[in-house]
UniProtKB/Swiss-Prot annotation:
Described function: Tetrapolymerization of the monopyrrole PBG into the hydroxymethylbilane pre-uroporphyrinogen in several discrete steps.
Annotated EC: 2.5.1.61
SUPFAM superfamilies reported for this sequence: Periplasmic binding protein-like II, Porphobilinogen deaminase (hydroxymethylbilane synthase), C-terminal domain
Enzyme class (EC, first level): transferase
Cofactor detail note: Binds 1 dipyrromethane group covalently.
Modified residues (S-(dipyrrolylmethanemethyl)cysteine): 241
Subunit structure as annotated in this protein's UniProt entry: Monomer.
Name of the protein in its database record: Porphobilinogen deaminase
Source organism: Staphylococcus aureus (strain NCTC 8325 / PS 47)
InterPro entries per record: HemC, Porphobilin_deaminase_cofac_BS, Porphobilin_deaminase_N, Porphobilinogen_deaminase_C, Porphobilinogen_deaminase_C_sf
Listed GO biological process terms: heme biosynthetic process; protoporphyrinogen IX biosynthetic process
Amino acid sequence: MRKLVVGSRRSKLALTQSQQFIDKLKAVEPNLEIEIKEIVTKGDRIVDKQLSKVGGKGLFVKEIQHELFEKNIDMAIHSLKDVPSVIPEGLTLGCIPDRELPFDAYISKTHTPLSQLPEGSIIGTSSLRRGAQILSKYPNLEIKWIRGNIDTRLEKLQTEDYDAIILAAAGLRRMGWSDDIVTSYLDRDTLLPAIGQGALGIECRSDDEELLTLLSKVHNDEVAKCVTAERTFLAEMDGSCQVPIAGYATISDQNEIEFTGLIMTPDGKERFEYTMNGTDPVELGKTVSNKLKEQGAYEIIKRLNEQH
């Protein structure tokens, strides 16, 4: 196998999960020589604005995909939730490895349970999806925008006027934070995850047979089926980052895929949700999308997209 160059965002989390994936590859192919090339993306350069207000898809991947096309790197290790549902022609997701915990972590300054936070308590999140679902269940709470990496957000929780923050559990775990700092992990009924949350997507050129063969050795087919249902739903709903959209699939005991799709308004007042089982992930994602459109969810999406 030739020497491989991996493209990664420059953040501590991105570099850590890239190294963890490289270790996984070396476990099946010990003699691999791999180097990481750090790439700064548009999303990394925007630190003073809410990403949903910037607009556009692929804020964290476009520059990395460009490096793949230019053959400056051989593969890219993405957080799958950052990858738009349509992959450019000539590139492919060469593998979906094991998924980390896909749920969100709720961290309270005083370790107060979410259901017991006093009226007017301020929760920090940079995600419309999280904000909408929290306001839907707890309209007496206040959502305040927060940006920055995990360390920055944890520091802001202590030094600014946040009573609690919500972060992806996967990032905390990959960075080695213990469960001690987490007040609770929020289950799917409290906070349905983002599309592909906790999963990685390994992107490479579609014609790189040698690399695709290597990547197949660390591919998790069950996770791939689940995230395919989720990503199909996202593509069918045409959900941009202005739309609170969530979707989560699991494999049932009967070996079927169970998928829940969710569309909301940012204020949490309108909610469209549907769950169903199936065996074909693409069909499942499309069917749930159609069910939500029948309920009126597409009107929300059109309205929110027109506002921006």
